[in-house]
Curated annotation (Swiss-Prot):
Organism from which the protein derives: Helicobacter pylori (strain P12)
NAD found in the keyword field: no
Example GO BP: division septum assembly
This protein's name: Probable GTP-binding protein EngB
Family designation: Belongs to the TRAFAC class TrmE-Era-EngA-EngB-Septin-like GTPase superfamily. EngB GTPase family.
Pfam families, per database record: MMR_HSR1
GO molecular function: GTP binding; metal ion binding
Required co-factors: Mg(2+)
Residue sites binding Mg(2+) per the record: 38, 59
Role: Necessary for normal cell division and for the maintenance of normal septation.
Length: 208
């Protein structure tokens, strides 16, 4: 079983020079405002590190967290950074600030070679939003051979059983499912342990 031995906040940045040095593999968490990024990060890491803004789209910083993962069964201990990007879709900012903000994020994703995994959170109740399609296309256009893109559906526990089953069968692969109530799900759906194992695999291996 994978245990998160340490998870702590590193820094926030709004410009590339403010980002911490790229000393370890990193995963990026992105998604629309109110998609549940903070809940996912806190559940994944077992600690309330990521904060939700009361105003959707208000947070315009990339937040960096250092995490240490341990898998005793396989004698593995590794450190990774988690990068929490601002939610997109609701930002009520001036055009000039929005352009500067998007420019920083695009540059961050383009040039930071330590990023190995992009995790795109999508609301399971709204699968065909244009903003999510555009985000997926833009990220996939950036991917290098040593990087991977993964969809992860949030709000899964808000669906009825038939909707859950259809999503599980029909969603484009690869994908994962997240809920803050993992234990309430049927055993046929991924558990928190499976989510952690999957992410660890992507962070440790070259997907090409």
């Amino acid at each position: 079983m994978i245990a998160i031995k340490d998870a702590h906040f590193l820094t926030s940045s709004s410009q590339l020079f403010q980002c911490p040095a790229s000393l370890t593999s990193e995963m990026v968490i992105l998604g629309r405002s109110n998609v549940g990024k903070s809940s996912f990060i806190n559940t994944l890491l077992g600690k309330n590190l990521a904060k939700s803004s009361a105003t959707p789209g208000k947070t315009r910083l990339a937040n960096f967290f250092s995490t240490t993962w341990e898998d005793k069964e396989n004698a593995l201990r590794a450190t990774f950074n988690v990068i929490d990007l601002p939610g997109f879709g609701y930002a009520k900012v001036s055009k000039s600030l929005k352009k500067e903000w998007e420019g920083f994020l695009w540059e961050l994703l383009s040039v930071r070679t330590s990023i190995k995994l992009f995790i795109h959170l999508v609301d399971a109740r709204h699968l065909d939003l244009e903003i999510d399609k555009n985000a997926k296309e833009n990220i996939q256009a950036l991917l290098r051979p040593d990087q991977a893109y993964l969809s992860l559906f949030t709000k899964f526990d808000k669906l009825n059983k038939n909707e859950q089953h259809r999503l599980f069968l029909n969603a484009p692969k690869p994908f994962l499912i997240n809920t803050t109530h993992f234990n309430a799900l049927s055993s046929k759906y991924p558990t928190l342990e499976i989510v952690r194992q999957t992410l660890l695999k992507y962070l440790l291996t070259n997907p090409s």
